[in-house]
Amino acid sequence: MAPNLRKSHPLLKMINNSLIDLPTPSNISAWWNFGSLLGLCLVTQILTGLLLATHYTADTTLAFSSVTHTCRNVQYGWLIRNLHANGASFFFICIYLHIGRGLYYGSYLYKETWNTGILLLLTLMATAFVGYVLPWGQMSFWGATVITNLFSAIPYIGQTIVEWAWGGFSVDNPTLTRFFALHFLLPFMIAGLTLIHLTFLHESGSNNPLGLVSNCDKIPFHPYFSLKDTLGFMFMLFLLTTLALFSPNLLGDPENFTPANPLVTPPHIKPEWYFLFAYAILRSIPNKLGGVLALAASVLILFLSPLLHKSKQRTMAFRPFSQFLFWLLIANLLILTWVGSQPVEHPFIIIGQLASLTYFTILLILLPITGALENKMLNY
């Protein structure tokens, strides 16, 4: 019998083992769709980004007008830009839901997969940040100034690092050109990290909602989950195109319709919605260095998840107290996101401080203690 090319060809067999004959737990729910949706987001962003880059000029005098030109004069330029800008929001929605799934179902116990996932999140955040600067509107400029300035809080070398990042003594032309270079490069780094992420995942196989070893009950990825993923693709692309066509500026900042002006500071500098929770944590600490450390800790705390898992059960499916804390954490993050969008005044300052404290308390103290208590309850 002739060998099956799909299984024998050096390249095709890699694709086959990853996407076709991959043994997959039969009971994974729709929460396992977000990995493939993130892949779709990445492909969409790279394609729309390449098309935008062909019409973009990375120069302070021309950047704003080149973006305007793309929207007004390029065939479907407005659509490509709207898809790219809102595609970033969907990228973050998917990655946050993906991380939430990982926390709820104990996927972080696959340590290598989890750690590469956090690196992917950090790279995505860096990509989104440098990308937001490129249209060179007011919020682009001042957002870049405020966030890069945070590095000056690092003792001794901080100011040098900031000036080195800026390529001068303020955010100017050298900053814009290097940010464009980084924004072009980083998505391909994300693509490379994604392959590493998948390699580690396929070493262990997927987790499942019960958190049990599912080797006795696995089915091929294709056609079952390839079809399920396709449904997810259609649903997400429908939502993305709906947003891009009906309300493209819903999630943007009106300040960005004004070209960057170093002499006029916007009344309220704030990042895009997907960074607001971290921005609220940064603002909740009156000390600059303390705020920067809290900001870093808000994301890097995810590295500790495998070490803080004290339960004998992997998932939260049968742990009602941990479930309550998990949803409390989600509500807390939504409060932080809302506070981050508000001005720095009473009562938002105290709400932000309490929400920041609660965020770290739940992750570092309450969840591990609850896990240990639930173990005790299993004995009775």
Swiss-Prot record:
Cofactor, how bound (note): Binds 2 heme b groups non-covalently.
An example Gene Ontology CC term for this record: respiratory chain complex III
Disulfide bonding pattern of the chain: none
Entry's Gene Ontology BP terms: mitochondrial electron transport, ubiquinol to cytochrome c
TM regions (residue ranges): 34-54, 78-99, 114-134, 179-199, 227-247, 289-309, 321-341, 348-368
Subcellular location: Mitochondrion inner membrane
Cofactor(s) annotated in UniProt: heme b
The protein's role, per its UniProt record: Component of the ubiquinol-cytochrome c reductase complex (complex III or cytochrome b-c1 complex) that is part of the mitochondrial respiratory chain. The b-c1 complex mediates electron transfer from ubiquinol to cytochrome c. Contributes to the generation of a proton gradient across the mitochondrial membrane that is then used for ATP synthesis.
Family, as annotated: Belongs to the cytochrome b family.
PANTHER family in UniProt: CYTOCHROME B (PTHR19271:SF16)
Complexes and interactors: The cytochrome bc1 complex contains 11 subunits: 3 respiratory subunits (MT-CYB, CYC1 and UQCRFS1), 2 core proteins (UQCRC1 and UQCRC2) and 6 low-molecular weight proteins (UQCRH/QCR6, UQCRB/QCR7, UQCRQ/QCR8, UQCR10/QCR9, UQCR11/QCR10 and a cleavage product of UQCRFS1). This cytochrome bc1 complex then forms a dimer.
Protein name: Cytochrome b
Gene: MT-CYB
